[in-house]
Amino acid sequence: MHIQTNRLILREFTNEDFDALFEILSDSEVMKYYPKPFDVDRVKGWIKWNQENYKNYGFGLWAVCLKDSGKLIGDCGITIQNIDGKLLPEIGYHIHKDFWQQGFASEAAAVVIDWAFENTKYDCLYSYMKYSNVPSYKTAQKIGMKKLKEYPDEKN
């Protein structure tokens, strides 16, 4: 599976992506809104979880790579999450901090939304984030998402 934009290629993760993904998901700034940055085992598990999602659902979080160089700069895609007691399709994204404020998250997320509506049964996607995650909230707004509800869930 490959999705392309003007600047990006989104593709399935492989085990060879570990080093680049570890650099992103182990960074305390990137993972500020998670309980803690990911360690080696958690990143390996993240890749495996997404590979299982590709098999089980036909989607997951995909590697976000620069089109001109192939450099992996993040992830973006759809996962099934328990939101308010319901299993719902959630769009998520993480971008390497060296590539923040350049529109890569919104560019990747916009093409993922288009892909999801064309290739899945879903007619609605969700973005579940910690209330204080202003950058992610702004990205969600930029791609046309609307706030539906706030949850009193401190861990998320």
Regions found by a protein language model. Name each.
Residues 1-32, 65-156:
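Acyl-donor (CoA/ACP) binding surface of acyl/acetyltransferases
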Residues 29-49:
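Conserved GNAT-fold acetyl-CoA-binding loop/helix
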Residues 38-42, 60, 87, 132:
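Short, conserved alpha-helical segments within structured domains
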Residues 41-48, 60-61, 98-100, 112-115:
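Low-complexity, flexible helical/coil segments
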Residues 49-51, 78:
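Short, P/G- and charge-enriched loop/turn segments at secondary-structure junctions
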Residues 51-63:
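A short helix-loop-beta-strand connector motif used in the catalytic cores of GNAT acetyltransferases and
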